[in-house]
Regions:
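Short, surface-exposed amphipathic charged segments that create phosphate/polyanion-binding patches used
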Residues: 46-50, 133, 152-153
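Short active-site oxyanion
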Residues: 92-97, 112-117, 148
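Conserved anion/nucleotide-ligand pocket segment
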Residues: 141-169
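Small/polar loops that bind or transfer phosphate-bearing groups
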Residues: 8, 120, 153
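Extended, subdomain-level signal for the structured scaffold at the beginning of enzyme domains
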Residues: 1-97, 105-109, 139, 167
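Acidic/polar active-site rim loop that often engages polyanionic ligands
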Residues: 105-113, 144, 159-160
């Protein structure tokens, strides 16, 4: 069974997590939430929390697909350095990686997108290009594949990308 790991920097957008989660949950996948928070919970916007996840420091299982989400704080670039190291390592080990909308910022901050093509939400393209000049920004696509790393331009295109992953499997 393929292991799908969903992760990101809180608070993330509900639909950024729920859309791909719903797609993946319809398939024969083992789905896990890995959190940058020690208790394994993750804040999502609107004051809600998702519980039942695993602290990234305790997660050491193989990952087939790593899915990275973001939210309103993602462009700030203020992330736990240990989490970013973990994310970069897992990105290099996973068969494939997906980032939806502002999750591209989180993946870029880890260094996993250096020298790669990527896309993010159109409102944030200039900010991504300025903050991460070693990422080749593609402004005209809804999603971009560079080797085993895929990025999508928005929340609903993240659902499209999740459907593409299912089709590939």
């Amino acid at each position: 069974m393929r292991r799908i790991v969903l992760t990101g920097v809180p608070p993330f957008e509900v639909q950024d997590l729920a859309g791909p989660l719903e797609v993946f949950s319809q398939c024969d996948y083992e789905i896990e939430l890995v959190s940058p928070e020690r208790d394994g919970s993750t804040a999502i916007n609107r004051g809600l929390r998702v519980t039942g996840g695993t602290d990234f420091r305790k997660f050491d299982r193989p990952i087939d697909t790593l899915w990275v989400v973001g939210g309103p704080e993602a462009p700030s670039g203020s992330y736990d350095p240990a989490y970013l190291r973990w994310l970069k390592e897992m990105s290099s080990q996973a068969r494939r990686v997906g980032a939806s909308c502002l999750g591209t910022f989180v993946l870029a901050a880890s260094g996993a997108l250096e020298g790669r093509r990527a896309v993010t939400h159109w409102q944030w393209c200039d900010h991504l290009a300025e903050r991460y000049p070693r990422v080749e920004l593609v402004r005209s696509s809804i999603f971009v594949k560079d080797d085993h790393i895929y990025t999508s331009a928005g929340i609903t295109t993240g659902i499209d990308l999740a459907l593409l992953f299912v089709e590939e499997d």
